[in-house]
C-alpha cells in the first residue's frame, strides 16, 4: 500500500466524540495508525523473495552436443543445494563454484555464496528402440526438449523463495530458435512455471535454419516451426487448430496462452509427443488418421491436462486423449456425426481382442479399447444427470488434479458431482466395449 496522507474519513473517526473519554480516543487513534503502518507489510507478506537463474546454452552441431552454463545471482545464497538426476553417457564435465559431488546418476551442487555458476556438457542425440530419434542435432538444425539440455533437478532453498529464470542460446551462424516461452526485449526467454519454485527449461524447442508460421487462435499465441526442406505442413496445422482449438478451450479453459508445435521428417521418431506448452509431430503424420482421430489433437489434450497416470492406468490418460481427438472434431464440424459414429465402431472392433488394460504403456489396441470405455462413461453420466453433466466435467477436474490419475479417482469425482455411484467398471471392459460397438454405418 503506498504511503501518503491519512484520509479525511480516518481523521474523522479519530476525533473525540461526546461521552468518549480522552484516553479512549487516544487508544483508538493509536490503533488506527498502527494498522495503517502494518498494512503495507501485510500486502507484501505473500510475495516471495526471488533469486535469479540464467541458463546459457551453446549448441555445437560438430559434436552433436551443447555446453550449458547455469548462473545464480541476486540472493543466490538462498539456494543451499541442487541435485541433478543425470545420465553419465549424456551429461559430463561438471564444473562450478562452491562444492560439486558426483554419484552414479546424480550430481549435487552446493553454490555456497551470493553468486554461483555451474557448467556441463550434454549430448543431444537420443535414439529410441525403433532406431529413430526424439532428440537430435544435425548440421542445419537441432530438435530437443528442455530436459534434454537441463536435467531433472531437486533443490533445497530458503523457505518462502523462488527463482526468476532466463534462458539464452548461443547459435551457429544463420540459425534461429523457438521455445514455448515469451521473450524479454533482450531476446532471452522468460522461464516461468507457476507451480514450480525452481524454474528450468521444459517443453519442445527447435533451433536451426527453419520456417515459422505464427497466428493467434482463440486467444492462444500459436507458433508452428520446422526445419526447411522437411515437408512440414505449417499452414495446414494452423488451419486444423483454427477449426478445433475453440472446442478444446471450452473443455480446458486453463489451456496455456502460448503453444509451440515443432515438426521434422526422418530420422526423427514417426509419431507425436507432447511437452509443457508444446508438442512435436513427425512431418509425415496426417492431421486426421484413417480411423478419424487426430495425432495433433491427441497431444493437445496432454498439453492441456499435464496429467500423470498411476501404475497400470496409462490406458486411462491415453484413452481420454484419443477420445477427445475424435470428439473435438465432431463438435467443430470437422467430421460429420456419421463419420464420428463409424470411427467409434472401428475403435471398438480394434479393441475387442484386448484382455488387459493395466499395461505399462498404452499402445494402439489398448488405447482403442480405452476410447470405448470413455464413451461409455460419458453416456452413463449424461443418462444419470439428464444431460446436465458429461465426461467434460470429469476431465476438467482431472486437469486440475496434481496427483496421479486412477480409475478410483474418476469414480470418486463422478460420485461427487452426480451424487450416485457409477455402473462404469473398466474391469468389465469386455462387456462395456461390446455395448459401444453399436452405431451408424458409413462407407
In which residue ranges do the predicted regions lie?
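Long, well-structured alpha-helical subdomains associated
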Residues: 335-383, 395, 409-410
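Second-shell loop/turn segments in exported
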Residues: 226-238, 282-287, 307-311, 360-364
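Bacterial N-terminal signal peptides
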Residues: 27-39
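Bacterial Sec-dependent signal peptides at the C-terminal "C-region" and cleavage site
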Residues: 38-49
